[in-house]
Regions:
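Globin-like tetrapyrrole-binding proteins
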Residues: 1-133
């Protein structure tokens, strides 16, 4: 991950977060993308989930070092593993695609470089989550 990617990601998430319905839109897209996903979220408080997601996005962005962030990712990965929530690895790719789709809708400066930055910034965290399944 390059410094420029982190900068683009950070600026983009700030633009998206200016609108309170950004993460709601993401969850609408994500839940509609798969029956499996919809079932996983059947009894979930989506407002609480959206707050946790925003925190997790920043943690994933900066998970390349600081031990407390890595500890958070470890906890998150354990929770999502086959022994707890059983989030299958292929669902993370769908998650990222729907997240970037929501970003495209909400970030007025979205372009191919922004798309690539979101993917490069989040990919290490996603790969970590998949590896702990």
């Amino acid at each position: 991950m390059h410094e420029r990617d982190v900068e683009l990601f950070n600026d983009s998430i700030e633009r998206c977060s200016c609108r309170s319905d950004f993460l709601n839109r993401f969850y609408t897209l994500f839940l509609a993308s798969s029956d499996t996903v919809a079932k996983k979220f059947e009894h979930t408080d989506l407002r609480k989930q959206a707050r946790m997601l925003k925190t997790s996005l920043y943690i994933m962005m900066s998970a390349s070092g600081e031990s407390e962030r890595i500890v958070h990712l470890e906890r998150l990965a354990k929770l999502h593993s086959r022994t707890e929530l059983d989030i299958k690895p292929e669902l993370y790719d769908l998650w990222l695609d729907r997240l970037v789709q929501a970003v495209k809708e909400f970030d007025p400066m979205f372009d191919a470089e922004t798309d690539a930055a979101w993917r490069r910034v989040l990919q290490p965290g996603i790969e970590f989550m998949k590896s702990k399944y």
